[in-house]
């Protein structure tokens, strides 16, 4: 009986169409990318937390260099963004090919927009990485004048990274539900499959909120350095912060494009896997 069950189980696996096998392959890459993003979120959060604790006077002789966490987070986020870009462009090419063959009856513009926004994300984290490395080379955080406004800005930054984590978690849910959507076609026992459009849309909204907050933070840090710390801090510290402002502007553009795309996908009201971020 066990031998027959195994044969039947293998036969079911072979029934997965070539198109769905390609979709599952892309979803696997996307899942790995999101796990890398979530790991990067931990580094970003620790970076922000150490800064806040130092500003509040909780200093330790063995305090780690916060910029090491920032660099590690940027490296991981850059790797994840490259993987997501590969997934987004491959998914767009596949659906565009089907559109040319007359197999679909809806616009492929949202998929194209998501693919384009993925390039902005690569640029964003590349610029952030350059800024983080320059920060590591040049900055002694003890020279920054701590004011109540400075602490508020650091608290906002910490909240922004919490929102980022929730956004990545939402896309993790969307990706897992996309797996269920495909696997459910070959498993009759799964009758109630969730629509991945909803967590994807929530995640896209959270990313935009996070990036707006980080732009505000980077601008406030720049103003603080110029107005409050100009006489005590190396002027070269301002340069990495200019890069942070530029990167966050690019991030807002990318997240706005992808949010609009996910809104259009949600309006289709069709159960399809979610690709991109």
Task: Identify the residue ranges that each predicted region occupies.
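Glycine-rich, hydrophobic membrane-spanning regions of integral membrane proteins that mediate transport
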Residues: 1-246, 260-277
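Alpha-helical membrane-embedded segments
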Residues: 210, 250-257
């Amino acid at each position: 009986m066990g031998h027959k069950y195994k044969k039947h189980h293998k036969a079911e696996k072979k029934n997965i169409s070539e198109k769905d096998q390609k979709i599952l392959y892309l979803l696997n890459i996307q899942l790995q990318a999101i796990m890398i993003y979530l790991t990067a979120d931990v580094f970003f959060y620790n970076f922000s937390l150490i800064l806040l604790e130092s500003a509040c006077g909780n200093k330790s002789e063995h305090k780690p260099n916060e910029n090491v966490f920032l660099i590690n987070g940027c490296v991981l986020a850059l790797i994840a963004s490259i993987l997501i870009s590969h997934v987004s462009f491959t998914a767009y090419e596949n659906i565009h090919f089907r559109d040319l063959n007359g197999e679909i009856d809806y616009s492929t513009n949202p998929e194209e927009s998501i693919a384009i926004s993925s390039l902005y994300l690569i640029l964003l984290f590349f610029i952030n990485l350059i800024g983080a490395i320059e920060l590591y080379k040049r900055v002694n955080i003890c020279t920054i004048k701590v004011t109540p406004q400075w602490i508020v800005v650091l608290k906002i930054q910490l909240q922004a990274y919490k929102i980022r984590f929730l956004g990545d978690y939402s896309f993790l849910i969307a990706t897992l539900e996309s797996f269920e959507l495909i696997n459910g076609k070959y498993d009759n026992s799964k009758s109630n499959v969730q629509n991945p459009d909803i967590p994807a849309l929530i995640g896209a909204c959270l990313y935009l909120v996070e990036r707006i907050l980080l732009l505000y933070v980077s601008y406030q840090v720049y103003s603080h350095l110029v107005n409050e710390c100009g006489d005590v801090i190396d002027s070269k510290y301002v340069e990495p912060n200019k890069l942070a402002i530029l990167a966050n502007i690019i991030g807002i553009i990318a997240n706005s494009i992808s949010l609009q795309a996910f809104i259009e996908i949600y309006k289709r009201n069709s159960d399809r896997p979610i690709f991109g971020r």
